[in-house]
Amino acid sequence: MAPAQAAQPAPAAPAAQAEGLSALVNPFVGTSSEGNAYPGATAPFGMVQLSPDNANSYGNTSYSPDNRWVWGFSHRHINSAGCPAAGEILVEPSAADSPITAREQIAMVDGSEAAHAGYYTVQLEGGVTAELTTTERVGVHRYEFADSDTGHLSLNVGETLRDAGSSEVAWVDDQTLEGFVENGGFCGGTSTTEKVFFSAHFDRPADSTGTWDGSGTYTEESPSSVSDGGQNGAVATFDTTTDQDVEIAVGISFVDVDGARANRTSETSDDTLTFAQARAAAEAGWDDQLGAATITASNDARIIFYTQLYKALLSPTIGSDVDGRYRGMDKAVHTAEGWTYHQTFSLWDTYRTQATLHALVARDHATDIVRSMYQQRVEGGWFPRWSLGSIETNIMAGDPASAWVAENFTMGTVPDDIADPMWDYLVENATTPTPGDVASVGRQSADFYNQNHHIPFYFENEPGLGQEYEEYRHGGSSSMEFAISDAAIGAAAQRSGRPEAAEFLERGQWWRTLWNPDVELSGDYQGIVNAVFPDGSFNVRSNEKDDVTKSGFHEGTQWQYQWMASQDYAGLQEVMGGTDEFLDRLDYYFDMPALLENPGQSPSHWAKGGSDYYSSIGYNPGNEPTIMNPWLYSSAGHPAYVNDVLASNLNRFPNTPGGGVGNDDLGTMASWYVMATLGFEPVVPGSGMMALNSPRVEAASLRLGPDADSPVLQINASGSHESMPRYIESVAVNGTDHSATWFDVEDILSGGTLDFTLTQDRDTPWGTSRADRLPSVSDPVQVKASATAGSPEFQSGVETTNVVGKVEFEELTKIADDAVTFPTVSATFTADGTEYEAQPEATDNGWEFSVTAEFAKAGNLSGTLSVSAGEDTPKFAPETFEPVSVEVPVKVLGADPTDDPSEPGTDPSDNPSDGGSGEPGTGPSTSAPDPSESGGTVGAGDAGGSGNADGSGGDAGLPNTGAKVAGIVAAALLLTAAGTVLVARRRKQN
């Protein structure tokens, strides 16, 4: 990935030619600076990506705006990945005397390219104008031959953006050509291939047809051609003297020619669909899909936003034919009944952002995508790591499938009928070595990892496992990835009530095995993550800028990877020496002084671009392991700093060919941009924790479903700015003031509101208290709770407030800066058939609970104080402590001293519902009525135990120390500052 560069805005189709949101999309964004985007036409998640080809390097995988020529227009492309792939069935137009029979450069007319969502056009040499659009499974072309009497259309199946294998073309008649090409390979990860079948139909009969073979020799009237590899193709020639336009519809399939033909005829109404109709339908489809998000912003901001949203909705791509058949990961043909199979999963990238965005704005596709992943596990024998069509490439490292699946469980996009087996597959995937007979490598080191809590690191340039397996030569980064995937599983398990929660939340802390406290770093810091050798020793042969061959960290330095523990903020702060040291190191990493001096600009200290992996120890804004780094500040009480970083980062997405920060990686960075622009980001997969930041739009609404009546998330951001930092003064979630720096995604999945008030004041106190910090998913506060009964006394007929008991926390957990905090708490007190909500007041080591109550009759009662963790405990965490309760003796005094149930000689028949009393205690009453009003003295001390209804059998009074009930610890997360008081309210028990 390379840096964004200043350039003129990329061309787009004139507004008069297209209306709606599709017209705002600029597909040329990301086509330079190693962005590797394709500018052609496609439908949302479309099987066909019909686009010009003029490059196939790692810097420009299919298209470069600097090359003012094309080879032609092929039907399948990968959205902004790091390596060339696909490029099958290349259509090459020509107005020359002879047709093109190999991949040749066809000159473009400068300034003639234009595109928007669903449409692309360019003028070529010889007076040829090419126009492209698509349905989901069909590429639709229109070629105008304005300056010639003859037009040739060559379909080249022997050359692709990779090394094509066998291929075949056959003329069915003078309007229809069918065949296939075998293609494959991606980033050096695999040599496996797959077949792409096609069925092409011209809008009129060709005047002549023919084929060419491996020699490149064209043979007119040849009905077919077969190749074992190399050149191969067919030509259709038309008389364009009077009718200058030729249209062609090309259906593709991964199953067979019959599937390609059925896709074509079904989606073109039996070949009657015109290019104009297809284009209008494509634009309407994009208008609807993009319409899931509406924003109030400037036109420039809307162009950038909808361009990025468009990129987020390109993949995974549809893989099943109109009849539901698809090619599975086992290479066999299967059928999706009642749903649509999707394929090509760039999981190492997309688990971080795209799965979440799809669940919000493309939920119907999201559930089908999840079901597709399930089928890939069933048919392929294991979850994929990085699948391209039906090919497992096994590129990248870690265990991204686990995090991706966990996030979908949390987002509610796992269909109920597959939820249980999919969960079982998920746990197996994370704990078991991959079987030897499956293509996916999974967690090869699972046994070692389960025992030692890290992946053994082997140098890739030395004998050993590192030369053979990516997981081992990337032992450092893969260990970090495993930990966050395990935390994601644990969080999703907790949310869904599954028993694996505690185990996997604890495994989320295993990244700490990599922390070497003795390494001295730039900036006078000490301690960093190191890859760990099989014997448990650190890889100290690596310095902080070494590349992966020396460090074991893939696509990033150890400085950058140290922050990839967002599931364990507390642990990260602890190993760095406390919150202050953590913040100081963050400031150095982001170069905060430069950000403050030049707001909205990227400091020179940052990595120069996404693929500038190893030359900088500073922030890399364009590569996946670091994209959640800005929100680290919210875990340490400084949420304003998040917006300083984001203002600079989001400005790296201009409306230019270099817009973005390198590879979008199949929608990952685009999804990140969309959500950050709206004011939130899913910083820990599986948790449902959406970290907040200042939106860059004035208002937005998200349609959380496919229909017009679907629930809506409304976002309002008073005081927003589109390029400069703004800070959160206040937030309301669903109408309730919200001081925490995050919200739970479940709060908005059924619709809701996020109301921001923004300010230019960087010193706004919002989100700075300890209770408001981003919580650690994998490092919960652990406390033991014990409840002690009080000695409350009430006067009959008078509303009185008394202390009914207290809860003390033993072994209080201290955060890195040694400030002691308490869990949130919920408490009820039940007596005489009525339940009261007890009001907590913080003490030195817990809470004291008071109840305001009124009892009608004097007597001794037995009450129960029940205390549990507060309702605002995060859904991804167990309760802070197990619920505790204690029986509380309650004395209700009468208006007359003779009504005092504790006085000797009191007639129990005066209060037949209460038993006799025990001996009174001596502790003072917390609150007592004025004796002058009651006509008697106030009793004191602990009340005795209640007797039976007949007046006999009263318990002896409890000792002054009170009764205690111990609670055993459960993992928890959310902390709150001492002194919080809950409002008491009274409710009748049913």
Please provide the spans of the model-predicted regions.
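Sec-dependent signal peptide cleavage junction
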Residues: A2-A15
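C-terminal low-complexity, Ser/Thr- and acidic/Pro-rich disordered "stalk" regions positioned immediately N-terminal
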Residues: K891-P959
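Accessory carbohydrate-recognition regions in carbohydrate-active enzymes
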Residues: A13-A355, A359-A403, F409-E468, Y472-M480, ...
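Beta-sandwich strand segments
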Residues: A816-A819, D872-P883
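Short, solvent-exposed loop/linker segments at the N-terminal edge
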Residues: S791-N802
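A cross-kingdom C-terminal cell-surface attachment/processing module
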Residues: N960-R986
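Aromatic sugar-binding surface patches on proteins
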Residues: D228-N232, T843-S850
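Residue-level recognition of secondary-structure-to-loop junctions
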Residues: A853-K857
